[in-house]
């Protein structure tokens, strides 16, 4: 700011310069005019304080013509200075507050992170424990499921055996009833037998209802879900990683914590279960038949697998996987053979080999692909054809020589398809006007024949008296049931099941006819080879006269089946003794046997009840 004194000095100098420019008097003139005399001097005065505080606004147009005074300039400067000072103070206070809050937040964040780190460690341990427990539980459930499937398969085999035994019982009763009906002699009068076919029918219906029950686990629990845990590469997405690197140290501690991700994998109908899939969880491995590791059940070794007997089940390692080997005891009819599993997978079964292929025993059950829903093939064993030979083991065996039992199939889509179907034919046996249907079995080898005993006996008696007269008497005896054929039984075609052949029967029988008569004929008449070929001996009784010196000649012809035996006896009364029970004690007798082989013909009854012969 210029003072008034300086302003006046400047004005005076300017005026002097203008005066000199306007006239050019000589320098001496200035002095002559009084220029050399000192004039009055400017006196400096003190400026008074600015009393005016409100100054009008000075626009840009007025700036050249009007210049603001010093008081106005000072007031404006002070006003701006106060405004800036207040702003700076506010910013400083805010900065102090923010610094304090930042320190507090950092301390609090550090405490929270420490707490979270402990919680995260506990949660991770809990997750690992949960995974182990879930895997253990899943393995136990798998063991139970496999045991259930194994037991269901055993139940199915037992149900099939029960059904076969029921059919055999019904067939046996019908066979017994047919034999009793065909016997019109003493056996028909002594024994009354009735077959309750309706009861068998009801039992078969109940058994079919029981077999139709699906015992396998449901489809929902066949494929158990699997829990998988994996480590997460980073707790935050990639776009935020750079920001996390610039974050405070307290936040960077989160990167040191290991984060895991838990996924529950479910399997559908096309998926694989944990014990059967290629991708498996921790510590879960399927077993193998040779080396049952984590999935072997053990060996089931029953003793004598017969009625009322039970086997011994020796479990292996109780871990999920395949079943062991089930070995029965005696391979008797109706018993099961060795069950060797194939691949240890759900619903699969191995090869079921029977013992002896006797009636009632099962054949080989070879499954297809041991996957859920696969079907196996049940091949029956070879059963002996019916035989009518004297040394055969059954009389008119009504079991077909090559029965068509159908297929034993196990199918299902996870219910292990275990719907077992067993198709059979039917056996039709006619007796009179009654038709008997046995289950669904079909005779493929022809009609069922039943052998009946019948005989025709011709007795010729020749008596020569002392005076030379000869009396000849012929007597013909015919019997349809063999009851009037005498004490001898020439039933060559009848055999005894489960009793052996006729040789065993002769040894077991205690009848005097088979003991004394056969020995006497072998020793005295020399007909042992003939009787050995026939397999049995036969004779007829003869009568003797009470007159003395009488010559008795007796001839007997017996026609049985396809052979005939003729016996002739020549005796003197004085040499003959009492003949009892066909034993020729001390007698000089000669017996001739003539046999003529004929093809055996079976006798069966027509629907009208009349017997007929079939070649």
From Swiss-Prot:
Protein localization? Secreted
Gene3D superfamilies tied to this protein: 1.20.5.50
Q: What GO terms are given for molecular function? A: protein-macromolecule adaptor activity; signaling receptor binding
Q: Extract the Pfam families matched here.
A: Fib_alpha (PF08702), Fibrinogen_aC (PF12160)
Q: Which terms are listed as keywords in the entry?
A: Adaptive immunity, Blood coagulation, Coiled coil, Disulfide bond, Glycoprotein, Hemostasis, Immunity, Innate immunity, Secreted, Signal
Post-translational modification remark: Conversion of fibrinogen to fibrin is triggered by thrombin, which cleaves fibrinopeptides A and B from alpha and beta chains, and thus exposes the N-terminal polymerization sites responsible for the formation of the soft clot. The soft clot is converted into the hard clot by factor XIIIA which catalyzes the epsilon-(gamma-glutamyl)lysine cross-linking between gamma chains (stronger) and between alpha chains (weaker) of different monomers.
**Which residues are modified by glycosylation?**
325
| Disulphide bridges, residue numbers | 455-485
Q: How does the record comment on the protein's domains?
A: A long coiled coil structure formed by 3 polypeptide chains connects the central nodule to the C-terminal domains (distal nodules). The long C-terminal ends of the alpha chains fold back, contributing a fourth strand to the coiled coil structure.
Question: How is the quaternary structure described?
Answer: Heterohexamer; disulfide linked. Contains 2 sets of 3 non-identical chains (alpha, beta and gamma). The 2 heterotrimers are in head to head conformation with the N-termini in a small central domain.
The record's function comment reads: Cleaved by the protease thrombin to yield monomers which, together with fibrinogen beta (FGB) and fibrinogen gamma (FGG), polymerize to form an insoluble fibrin matrix. Fibrin has a major function in hemostasis as one of the primary components of blood clots. In addition, functions during the early stages of wound repair to stabilize the lesion and guide cell migration during re-epithelialization. Was originally thought to be essential for platelet aggregation, based on in vitro studies using anticoagulated blood.
**Protein's UniProt name:** Fibrinogen alpha chain
Which species is listed as the source? Bos taurus
